Amino acid sequence: MTSIRLTQYSHGAGCGCKISPSVLDVMLKSSLALPVNDALLVGNSTKDDAAVFDIGNDQGVISTTDFFMPIVDDPTDFGKIAACNAISDIYAMGGKPIMAIAILGWPVNLLAPEIAQQVLDGARAICAEAGIPLAGGHSIDAPEPIFGLAVTGLINNAHIKRNNTAEVGDLLYLTKPLGIGIMTTAEKQGKLLPEHAQLAPQAMKTLNVIGQKFAELEVVTAMTDVTGFALLGHLLEMCQGSGVAAVIDFEQVPRLDFVNDYIDQGCVPGGCERNFISYGEHVGPLSPKQKILLCDPQTSGGLLVAVKPQGKEAFEALCQENGLNLQPIGELVAATSPTVSLLS
């Protein structure tokens, strides 16, 4: 076990490094006409998880990239988490990953190259678990450690799961518990108890491979993964893109054990407030704890899945077959204001 604390070498952590949604919207605005290409099935106009390009014979190639600063101190775990997080975008589209290349920024005058080697070994382990090669990459000398992957995948075009095709009446499911940003903030503040040290990393190192199986279900109308914009942010993207609203049962939202204890100790990521400022106007009243948990930036978070109500039994049965015991966390309703509200 290394004595290096990687989180002390970066100003951000994991997907909490993301630029806020409101600022990103300004950056991505352009007066240039977008090129028309009918083969581009999914681009950046819908804020989806990855791009999909039609390559013929009902097949699409999926392309995505994701990288960030350390969210844990252990280099191998950092590599595993970053790899899981990047590959997740392929699964969120319903696809199968086939190859990855690494993106590495490293402060070579501050951190030994052997530590970067451990990061890469962690990524290789996850790529092997996903059945894909880490086939290359690019590195630069950077003031802070940064790592991630660019990932390529394949998909049957009929099975593409977008984030803007949900329907009124759909049930909402979340495949991983919330609280990752809160727990990793507790670690950075030195408040995390040793017996809780693996709660967040274990979730973050779990591949969202079940997304491939969800893609084969017609009753799954939309899917995305929950990362830096938190559950509320990614749910809002789904609702606004689909022209619907959502009602969430807060008590049914899964969360990591002991997360409320760390909220009480003030272990709140800076990204919580940035997220709420960006989209809070579209959300109904929240208690302080509800706001923190629902706006908590997730790294390598779970899949948010919209399921037709008549598909509830089949969907939950598939989940149970794959070790997931899921219950609906809410449902989609006709568009209204606020776009997302909590069950009273």
UniProtKB/Swiss-Prot annotation:
Pfam hit, one: AIRS_C
Record-level GO BP terms: selenocysteine biosynthetic process
Binding-site residues for ATP, renumbered to this chain: 18, 46-48, 66, 89, 137-139
Co-factor remark: Binds 1 Mg(2+) ion per monomer.
Lineage: Bacteria, Pseudomonadati, Pseudomonadota, Gammaproteobacteria, Alteromonadales
Site residues by UniProt (Important for catalytic activity): 18
InterPro entries named among the record's database cross-references: PurM-like_C_dom, PurM-like_C_sf, PurM-like_N, PurM-like_N_sf, SelD_I, SPS/SelD
Protein name: Selenide, water dikinase
Catalytic machinery residues: 15
Any GO MF annotation of the entry: ATP binding
Superkingdom per UniProt: Bacteria
Class in the EC hierarchy, top level: transferase
Obligatory cofactor(s): Mg(2+)
Binding positions (Mg(2+)): 49, 89, 225
Subunit and partners: Homodimer.
Native source organism of the sequence: Colwellia psychrerythraea (strain 34H / ATCC BAA-681)
PANTHER family listed in its UniProt record: INACTIVE SELENIDE, WATER DIKINASE-LIKE PROTEIN-RELATED, SELENIDE, WATER DIKINASE
Family (UniProt): Belongs to the selenophosphate synthase 1 family. Class I subfamily.
Keywords per UniProt: ATP-binding, Kinase, Magnesium, Metal-binding, Nucleotide-binding, Selenium, Transferase
